[in-house]
Amino acid sequence: YNPFAYIHSEKDILKLVTTLIANTKGEGKAGDDFWVKAETLLYTALIGYIHYEAPVEEQNFSTLIEFINAMEVREDDEDFKNPVDLMFEELKKRKPDHFAVRQYAKFKLSAGKTAKSILISCGARLAPFDIQELRELTAYDELQLDTLGDRKTALFIIMSDTDDTFNFLISMCYTQLFNLLCEKADDVYGGRLPVHVRCLIDEAANIGQIPRLEKLVATIRSREISCCLVLQAQSQLKALYKDSADTIVGNMDLSLIHISEPTRRTP
């Protein structure tokens, strides 16, 4: 599964970055969104460059990691330019209004020490993608998510029940799936997919956060898409989606609750 394979516009880049930020951890101070915003600018710039300028076989997270690794910062030399700086300078000469160039220029407003801290946070957030297993998993795509509503298809996404290291990939997959199918329903099929797509999301609280899920569950049904969230307890949804949890439940057509007896202990 390669999330880059489903990027077709600047809007798709922003959606991918939002999902990445929501389901991974950086090194910024808790409660301070400065680092998150700064990272967002950098990811948007680099992914924009990769999508629009890199060969197809290099459009993946491995290339993003290589870009981050090449971004050396020297606090005592503000005029120093790393390979990525030079790469963007060359692109700016050819395409001064390029989406990636504009985003990178905003990131470069940060001073040397601040830029170094941002890069450290990026490295921490992207650490899972530096594992060989995940590099291979995201090197190319064979899921063809945008075809699920064209014909009857069964796609099983299986995660480990003991290790949640890679669970954020599943939330990323669902986010792209919903966006792709909604756009295809509207642009190709006049508003409704020819084949109903039913997503049975077991352990929904353990796959990471799907951005804007409270709005998605209210709008996807009209496109012949349905979503069934399976939870151990409704409090799990509250812990993950905070104030949006009640809205998510309210936008569901049906709620089934299985009440189990508490374990009785003999004295």
Regions found by a protein language model. Give the residues of each.
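P-loop NTPase motor domains
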Residues: 1-225, 240, 257-258
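Conserved H-loop
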Residues: 232-236
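Single conserved hydrophobic/aromatic residue that forms the stacking wall/gate
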Residues: 257-267
